[in-house]
Amino acid sequence: GVGLGNDPMNVDELKFVYENSQIALPSMATNFQYHSPLLLKTNINFIMVVHGEQRLSVTNPLPVSGDFITNAKVIGCYDKGPGKGAIIEVETTVNLKKDNTEICKLVSTTFARGDGGFGGPESPKKELVRPEGKPDYVHEINTKPDQALIFRLSGDYNPLHSDPNFAKSAGFERPILHGMCTYGIACRSIIESVCDKDVKKLKRFDCRFSSPVYPGETIVTEMWKDGNNVYYQCKVKERDKMVIKNG
C-alpha cells in the first residue's frame, strides 16, 4: 500500500512483503483506528471529514500477526468556529490479547470541515520548530495512479479515495490519496534514511496533514536530525506543495 516491494530484487523491501522473513512497518498500527465506532455515533457530516493529524507512540514492535484488543476514547473536541469546522481527537490503545502487552498508542485527529460553531473550546496550537538550514536527508517516493485503490485494501474504504463523484462533492477535483498512505510513505522514508532500515529504532511518529496528495504524484520527505530526534516535512514534487508538516 505504501510502495514496498516495487523492486522485487530489493531484499530490504522484500522483508515487508515476503512471508518467509516478514516484518511490519510501524505505521501499519494505524489500521486499528478504522474499526472504532466512536465517530459513527455522532451526527457529523462525513462527506466533509478529512484526517487532520496523526500521532503514534510505539511501546513494543508490531507483530505481523496475532489477536489484539483496542480501546478507544475521545480525548478532545474543539470548535474552529461557524463555517470553519471542528477538530475531534481520538486516542486508541493497542494491546496483544494473549498477555495484554501494550503495542502502541495512537491519537488520530479528525477535521470535520462542516461541523464548526457548536460552542466548544478552541483547538490548542502546537507548532514544532525544526532546526534551521538545509535538510540532512531527502527521500523521494513516486506514488502510482492506482495507489489509493491499493491502499484502501488495508481497511479504509472511505469513498473519498476511490469514487470520483464523491470526491467532487467533497470539494476535490478527483479522489485523493489516504492521509495514512502519505503517513506510511513518510514513515518508510525515515526508516530507510535515518534508522538504518531498522523499524525498532522508530519510537514515535507524529504529523499534521496540511494538503492532500493525488495518486500518481511524487512525495518528497525532507528530514533534519537533532540527536535522537528527527524533524520532517513532506511535499509534492510536481506542485511544490507542502502536504505534511509538524513532523
List PLM regions with ranges.
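HotDog/MaoC-like acyl-thioester-processing domains
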Residues: 49-139, 209, 213-216, 220-247
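Hydrophobic, proline/glycine-rich low-complexity stretches
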Residues: 1-67, 194
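Long, contiguous hydrophobic alpha-helical segments, chiefly transmembrane helices and signal peptides
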Residues: 25-31, 49-52, 56, 111-112, ...
